[in-house]
């Protein structure tokens, strides 16, 4: 009665709030925990829609401080934006109000007839089995028709990359013999047969040779910036080996080897010193440096409608640490080198699949294709998806092809959980949060898109 009295003064309230509260408070007795949770979600949605309908349009509680729609306005309002933390909190709070312990109810005063648990469980299991089989039947055709790259296209793109790599290697040896470099080599998902949809990008690693006694790497978490997964490369022993003792002293900024300055050095070589049109005519390609901001990227047209982008990526190795000049998303960290984990991640994934003929790589490629084809999921990277699969591989042992649908759904749920926490630890280096460079708004949008797909995951395969 107290609840009803409090709601009495609400504008135009006809008692629906009291009815909803009564339904929610007794749902546990009739439906059980799972049914009560689902009823809670549905009832909360109806209740909010009703409240929104009877509230004044200018009500300040309907908009966030920024004026944007928030989690209080779900997807039926036509907003593609992700649910924010306010609605997550509201939804969690609403579900938490549902009783979950049978001891909380007085069974002497209210003993409704219990449904047959065995029959109900059997119906639920049958429905889940049918949904899983339906999804399983759709995942493999999606991979064949949408994700997999035709073998011919993949071979031609690889050959174009090999030709460009050979030309650059010859140029560097002939024109820049004093530059201490190891041989350049190809890397990336195309090279590792993990690229999807179209063969359109590959990395060309340019390894710098650094004197081990003149340089050291400092983990980002040990600096004032506190950025795990990144390193500073410090110039050592300047009192014994003055500036100029190392070729790469010319790229030192503030006592540290600057990846940006190194990249600028190679940009002059890639864009200014090499006659790419002449090389392209010799190889029967159209080659040109990509426009800014892709300063260290070549665009190669190897067929009339086929383009390959080759990223030049300077790299340094100090001890067991391999770093690449791939900048942090925030400009304030442009003096940091990124820890290279991709080769080790790919090797672990391949080794796991080879050991049991599993479908981990297949599941990863389907997820990558979905993200590449869905603009709302475009901020998810191959590294993040790979680590979701690696974490799941530690929890689940059976990765036979028949389990593809189950593992796919588990990967989606796991990804949503990581997004909700805002943390995706690297499977190889747990100190590294792979979501650290995403903004809260991007995390919300990604989480909402995936959250909405859980009820009907086939929608993701239709993009």
From Swiss-Prot:
One of its GO terms (cellular component) is mitochondrial outer membrane. It comes from the Eukaryota. One of its GO terms (biological process) is positive regulation of protein targeting to membrane. Mitochondrial outer membrane protein which regulates mitochondrial fission/fusion dynamics. Promotes the recruitment and association of the fission mediator dynamin-related protein 1 (DNM1L) to the mitochondrial surface independently of the mitochondrial fission FIS1 and MFF proteins. Regulates DNM1L GTPase activity and DNM1L oligomerization. Binds ADP and can also bind GDP, although with lower affinity. Does not bind CDP, UDP, ATP, AMP or GTP. Inhibits DNM1L GTPase activity in the absence of bound ADP. The modification Phosphoserine is found at residues 55, 59, 79, 94. Residues 49-195 are annotated as: Dimerization. It is a single-pass membrane protein. This is Mitochondrial dynamics protein MID51. Residues 1-23 are mitochondrial intermembrane. The chain crosses the membrane at residues 24-46. Residues 47-463 are cytoplasmic. The keyword Cell inner membrane does not apply. Residues 57-79, 104-123 are annotated as: Disordered. InterPro entries: Mab-21_HhH/H2TH-like, MAB21L/cGLR, MID49/MID51, MID51-like_C. The keyword Magnesium does not apply.
